[in-house]
Amino acid sequence: MSTRLPSIYQDFIHISRYARFNDDLGRRETWDETVDRYISYFKSKTDNNKKVPWDELRTAILNLEVMPSMRCLMTAGPALEKDQVAGYNCSYVAIDNVKAFDEIMYVLMCGTGVGFSVESKYTNKLPEVPEDLHESDTTVVVADSKIGWASSYREFISLLYSGKIAKWDVSKVRPSGERLKTFGGRASGPEPLVDLFKFTLNIFTKARGRKLSTLECHDIVCKIADIVVCGGVRRSALISLTDINDDQLRHAKSGDWWTHNGQRALANISAVY
């Protein structure tokens, strides 16, 4: 007999966020099936000699007496096997290296929340943007995967730091609405990534001859989060850590910021002291 969650709201959250679609049955999982998928996955990763009370754990989760990592509950199985970052609820990175941006993209695409620091002691370690940015014949070809998106963004930013404005080819990215069979949900299509390329180019163009400001770093990360759609359902979760005397970040959400900088809605901002 299937275990029912106590309320309609809990049913909705389970079905919309955690229940995977079962192709064989032509429907989404029941609560029991979601828990069984989770237990089965971690059982397969555990030494048989270890006496883990799997039946007790299953019963406790079914009855909401304990709860595992909700990211794992969503992804346990092929999705978690492929991208193990998807098992973590949250992560942290300091923006002290140009690779931080594409790493954040990958982590967010796995559904994991990101805390990031734009404290000046970190952002000052970034290189200067060249005074001369010129169009090049280089084309960044985007592969249709999380790693593909992140790798293409790393290449695009690296080329900007070398003074080259690359073209991009998103022809391999599946169209919007197509099913994501491994991770679940629907594809967002290539348009959001193209939007990110244009946004990043605009910021780098304004920053020619100097380093990116803390606010510019913050905005790039927020824009990355804005274009990431995890499993067609889960949006990005961010917290931005700043210097306590950073007036630009302090006023980042003052006035009608949402009119021209709507990406800033994606992150909470907290001062470090």
Protein language model features and the residues they cover:
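Extended catalytic cores of very large enzyme megasubunits
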Residues: 1-273
